[in-house]
Regions:
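Outer-membrane beta-barrel "beta-signal"
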Residues: 207, 269-289
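C-terminal hydrophobic structural anchor segments
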Residues: 208-256, 260
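Outer-membrane beta-barrel proteins and related beta-barrel translocases across Gram-negative bacteria
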Residues: 34, 43, 142, 194, ...
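Sequence/structural signature of outer-membrane beta-barrel proteins
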Residues: 16-27, 66-68, 86-89, 120-127, ...
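Outer membrane beta-barrel
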Residues: 1-122, 132-134, 140-149, 206-212, ...
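Hydrophobic, lipid-facing positions within transmembrane beta-strands of outer-membrane proteins
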Residues: 41-44, 100-104, 113, 134-138, ...
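Detector for outer-membrane/organellar transmembrane beta-barrel domains
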Residues: 110-111, 142-231, 279
Length: 289
């Protein structure tokens, strides 16, 4: 739900419920939302835009996704992939797509360049919930000739048990996006530590193709890896390849299918097939006169 409240203040509110059934351990169907059988508020925030001269300033306050890298829900949900990237999944020693902030952010920029600074307290959902404490996120973004490149940094409390997870969770990341003629590429690379004495590096690159010749089909492919280095058996070196499609059957109904080949992921086989159907309902309120 979104709209304008008063005097140029915009609001966004989102609630979700998801459930995963079965005894097999999997990271399927967690692209942008938790599947823990609880109804919860994901985002609830207000924005105010200011335009001093050629610049643009956006002030945001409330509960919102941690603005690190490619972090929007629409960047990952219902886009053709049924699993989050490895560096964006709960419990894979990186930065989950379910990390959120209770706080405020200020974004300031001119055409083709912006800087965003955020301060808040963790408000995470899902399995990887950070411990309470002030955290900060800084992101810069530049665009040139159809390419958008961003650099991000985050410092926060870890989400693992304080019995062994000392220090802070700190990551730096690089992301890029490009689109032309129905072909889009995007990807992220991340490096840092989930807590002291460990190191996580990894990234992914996504290809999306939606050309007139494909009709209702959007083809997708992903290549990714994640390396978690620690001096115990929990070290993880994972690789995953995904090929699939999003098929629009009706204006409100679509199918998504993924074929997966992977290695190095605990408790998961080398191959998988994911299939999902999405039905959309939309309600538009009449404009006030």
């Amino acid at each position: 739900m979104f709209g304008e409240a008063f005097s140029g203040v915009r609001f966004t509110a989102e609630a979700v419920w998801g459930a995963r059934y079965g005894t097999t351990q999997t990271d399927a169907f967690g692209a942008a939302y938790p599947y823990d059988r609880d109804l919860k508020v994901m985002e609830a925030f207000a924005d105010r835009i200011f335009r001093p001269g050629p610049a643009l300033v956006v002030v945001r306050a409330g509960r919102f996704r941690t603005p690190f890298g490619i972090s929007g829900a629409s960047d990952h949900a219902y886009a053709g992939f049924l699993r989050a990237p490895l560096i964006r999944y709960d419990n894979y020693w990186a930065l989950s797509n379910n990390v959120l902030e209770h706080g405020a952010s200020v974004t300031a920029g001119v055409p083709r360049f912006l800087v965003q600074a955020t301060a808040g307290l963790p408000a995470d959902t899902g399995a990887a919930v950070r411990h309470s404490g002030l955290d900060g996120v800084l992101r810069t973004q530049v665009s040139l000739r159809g390419v958008i490149v961003g650099v991000s940094g985050v410092s926060s409390k870890p989400y693992m048990s304080p019995r062994f997870a000392r220090g802070r969770m700190q990551f730096a990341g690089l992301d890029a996006r490009w689109m032309n003629g129905g072909v889009a590429l995007k990807g992220e690379w991340l490096s840092g530590q989930p807590f002291d004495g460990t190191k996580t590096t990894g990234g992914y690159i996504d290809l999306t193709v939606h050309r007139p010749a494909l009709g209702p089909v959007t083809a997708v492919a992903r290549a990714e890896r994640l390396d978690y280095t620690v001096n115990n058996p929990r070290a993880m070196h994972a690789v995953r390849y995904v090929a699939g499609a999003r098929i629009r059957l009706l204006d409100t109904l679509s199918l998504q299918a993924n074929v997966i080949r992977q290695s190095g992921i605990p408790n998961q086989g080398r191959s998988a097939f994911d299939l999902a159907a999405t039905y959309v309902l939309r309600f538009d309120s009449p404009r006030s006169q």
